[in-house]
Amino acid sequence: MYDNPLSAFTNTSLPHQGSAGIQFAVVGAGVVGLCVALEAQRRGHHVTLIDHTEPGKATSYGNAGYLATEIIDPLGTPDVLRAAPKLWLNPKGPICTPWRYIAKAIPWYWRFLNAAQAEPAQRGTDMIHQLNQAAVGAWQRTLADINASALLIKGGHLVVWENTQKRDEAHQLIEKMHRYDIPCEFVDAERLAQLEPELSLSLSHAVFFPESHRLTDPYEVCRALFDAFSARGGVFINAKVDDVHPSSNTHIDLRIAAQTQRFDKVALCAGVWSKQLLERVGITVPLEAERGYHVTFPHDAARIHHTVLSADRKLVLSPLNAGLRAVGMSEIGGTTLPAIKKRYRVLREHTKGLLPKLFDNPQLESTEWMGYRPSFPDSLPVIDLHPMYSRLSFAFGHQHLGITQAAISAELLLDKIEQRPSLIPLDALRVDRF
């Protein structure tokens, strides 16, 4: 780590406009933008990465860090709609919207209700499954290319239940996963205690996913991606992009730090902040900030060996190099309201229910964080070209699966830009699908 991280990242020099080859700009230096920038470099482009924050320090920073390839359903399904009133009214539940934001959120929720009907939800599941199937292989290629394969761990993960009456729920999950060729198995309380001896003895059963992977730490991975990008001649501009202006179909002008810079091609990968830039090029999308919270505890307080997801509490516990991280909440709340402190208290309470040993020390220290998942009502990202200006492309809106799908999204986007055959049909991910 650097004493002053930005001093190590900031490069306000602008790309040489007369250099040979394609001048390719990537707006957004989260994990998706970093993967796109590296993939564009690999394909011979001269790449400039632009963000007003340090690479990997915004939404990507606080992720749980595991590749959630078994999460194949969109956030909205008929089952979720049936459970929504109970989830919404539960003061310790995972779904919430700040009162001050409800009026603004209504249009998004209306589209969410439509997307959660049986037929569109099933289409969403099929699309997410295709992306997730390809996710681990893409990450393996990406990290091997930068000599950082050790940052990806095949550690397996557990979905756990406390309620003994919910064994059928576990078996239904196993049956569904097997239909999609996702390996998993039932785990009783005795074996669960062997796999994770520090978890609460109140846990009844679990489903174990032996083939799942996790990253050592999301920020550590972003740093490795950025370091490789820089070592290969990539330029980073630490500034805000104020405007995007396609000039016919020959180039794209970006307004950066009161200067207009011209690029041959531009990829918008700015997460939830992509929305306002799209409006500058005539596209309106129902993209919202789905705020997520985490609390990170020190390693020595308690240890788990696998990523643990609580089916009852809707919480993820993730063992990272940065510490033991508890991640949760799905809060449609925009980007301007402050974090709601109650969410951190709820996360700690849920964590204590799963891992009581962690709280043996009354002076336990921890860090808190809140970030903005870019979320569409149908839970699918955009991976597409502008319908009128093909030199302008998009990869954003991955909701809970930004870390999972970042590397495969980069490969798919560059294939589309270069008009190569796609491994996965991308029609469902069009920018104008709404």
Task: Give the ranges of each region predicted by the language model.
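Extreme N-terminal leader/targeting segments of oxidoreductases
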Residues: 1-24, 42-43
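Glycine-rich FAD pyrophosphate-binding loop
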Residues: 42-62
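Dinucleotide-binding Rossmann-like beta1-alpha1 core, especially the glycine-rich loop
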Residues: 65-189
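Short beta-strand to alpha-helix junction loop
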Residues: 123-136, 159-169, 194-195, 208-227, ...
